[in-house]
Amino acid sequence: MAAVQCLTFLFLFLLQNATSASPLPLFRRPIQSNHSNFVKHPRRSQVVFPVNHSSCDLFAGEWVRDETYPLYRSKECGRGIIDPGFDCQTYGRPDSDYLKFRWKPFNCNVPRFNGVKFLQEMRDKTIMFVGDSLGRNQWESLICMISSSAPSINTHIIHEDPLSTFKILDYNVKVSFYRAPYLVDIDKINGKTTLKLDEISVDASNAWRTADVLLFNTGHWWSHTGSLRGWEQMETGGRYYGDMDRLVALRKGLGTWSSWVLRYINSPLTRVFFLSVSPTHYNPNEWTSRSKTSTITQGGKSCYGQTTPFSGTTYPTSSYVNQKKVIDDVVKEMKSHVSLMDITMLSALRVDGHPSIYSGDLNPSLKRNPDRSSDCSHWCLPGLPDTWNQLFYAALLY
């Protein structure tokens, strides 16, 4: 009888301890892989998020001035890393205050990026950005952040199309960018460039499946018209269309991508993120309705000449709000398979962060006409994509 009572007590003790275990914090799922050292991260001694993790929204906050920024200088990235179109300081941008702002969530603190820690956690792994030139913008940012905070590492870079890879040899880490602006396939059919809404190319699929961490993005290319349109016809359901409602096309394309993720990605083994739409600042009507206390330069016809973020924590409108809703809906339908990096609002506040005319891609005559030539789509490096990567770092490792 005593033995039975002892076993009963032991069972109840174990049951109580098992059921009272604390849940994983927000943005921290078990990370596993076919590599033996890619295991669930132990709880850190430094508490980054509050006790009530559900109250921590990394993407709701405000921009605060921080004199310790930027995280790096462009010369620390290595030769040929930053695209000339993103290297604003090198190509003549006269102001630098836009580099002195840090994103501060309301209810939690974002860990400062630590390149050595990142490489230790990602040893023997491949991190792959997949998407358009905004994905490239973020890829180059992460390379710079790693190179500046772990300066003694041996590296090698391969620039190819569609796949470019930055290798950190000491840790056997690969940070890659796969160019796929629509995510779905685009190919010649009967002599016409065709956007195939129901297909992802075999080459893309094979490349993506080699990654341990995937971060996808798409958006801007779906709304391009005229000479900027990247296709001549669309194909879906075995039928061809000269055009269709772009949001319908985006929804179909993302449905194809979603099916691919659910079919080929083993969630416990591979982490998948999706970057929400990165806003543009070409239309001054989006910000002229703001209060007179706004810090924005009035009268501008684009992002040119803007040197400070929007004051406040909200942005009145955006030309990409409908695209964002489509992306949000698709990702939410996938539940735990994909984590949404909802950077749209925090980025919309950074009208000051674009290259404008300070781009190595513009000749002098184009720079003399900023209202027509300014790049208000991409972002300066150093700059806003560094914040995207700090949030990515927090979501991935904490």
UniProtKB/Swiss-Prot annotation:
GO terms for cellular component: membrane. A motif (DCXHWCLPGXXDXWN motif) lies at residues 375-389. The keyword Membrane applies. It is a single-pass type II membrane protein. Keywords: Membrane, Signal-anchor, Transmembrane, Transmembrane helix. It comes from the Eukaryota. The chain crosses the membrane at residues 1-21. Disulfide bonds: none annotated. A motif (GDS motif) lies at residues 131-133. One of its GO terms (molecular function) is O-acetyltransferase activity. It is found in: Membrane. PANTHER family: PROTEIN TRICHOME BIREFRINGENCE-LIKE 45 (PTHR32285:SF311), PROTEIN TRICHOME BIREFRINGENCE-LIKE 9-RELATED (PTHR32285). Contains 2 motifs that are conserved in esterases, but it is unlikely that this protein belongs to the catalytically active pectin esterases. Belongs to the PC-esterase family. TBL subfamily. May act as a bridging protein that binds pectin and other cell wall polysaccharides. Probably involved in maintaining esterification of pectins. May be involved in the specific O-acetylation of cell wall polymers. This is Protein trichome birefringence-like 45. It comes from Arabidopsis thaliana.
